[in-house]
């Protein structure tokens, strides 16, 4: 297949690229290197076509997708805290940029699998969260993801093949410093023999899913006969931030206690994915357990894995 990966030098995108190259696909990457890094592609540099550009550049996008079989759309701005200060920029990239891809999909007929987010649910009324549950955002980043979903719905009615994967909290190697998740932040502190810092009371829960499992969900979605759907991608196994901090400390063998800091604006209290749909429709299920991965990384000091 001939595939374009937007944001292909980023955390999730670069792992998708590696999988596609290994499979033998013809892969082009579009990335402006705002948070992505060329070194993330070091394993596949000789097997890809890399274009330094922006998803807001319509003519450039058109040139790249006109003969594509599919697009994995991972390019986005993804910091909740940053979105509070840069609302217009976030809308421009995450909404207008996504619409560019959907417009071109309508014209050229390729399938789109793109990164949505569990943040579209806001603070859920019930746990676990099903795809049919209410969407009620609590920060500008989440609102851009919801607006992109509304566009996907609109374009699907025009015949565009599009699947939105609602990522929960993805962890693994290559997370950028700008968008680092709490696991990376905790492990960075432990590596320095410093205690993890917790924002708020630590009782907020998160649903963590490993990067390799996320890649597999993307591949299955693209290869499926499904033409339109939103699907949760998580582990279905929530853990509180306090329990996560203590797990990291225990695995390190250090005598530390978490440091409590003020809660973050726009933070969600609890989240947990219902995986019924993605298991049924794609035959997907997560394989990597957070606890096992953390113990392996910390006990063997494989901090390059973050």
Where are these regions (language model features)?
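N-terminal Rossmann-like NAD(P)+-binding domain of SDR-like oxidoreductases, especially those catalyzing
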Residues: 1-170, 284, 306
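Active-site loop of classical SDR/Rossmann-like NAD(P)-dependent oxidoreductases
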Residues: 35-37, 181, 241, 262-277
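Conserved mid-core alpha-helix of short-chain dehydrogenase/reductase
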Residues: 60, 100-104, 208, 213-216, ...
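Glycine/proline-rich active-site loop of Rossmann-fold NAD(P)-dependent oxidoreductases
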Residues: 146, 161, 170-185, 194-195, ...
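Hydrophobic alpha-helix immediately C-terminal to the catalytic Tyr-X-X-X-Lys motif of short-chain
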Residues: 147, 151, 155, 186, ...
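Non-catalytic, hydrophobic alpha-helical segments
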Residues: 214, 218, 233, 244, ...
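PAPS/PAP-binding and catalytic site of the sulfotransferase fold
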Residues: 240-252, 293
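Amphipathic terminal alpha-helices
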Residues: 290-306
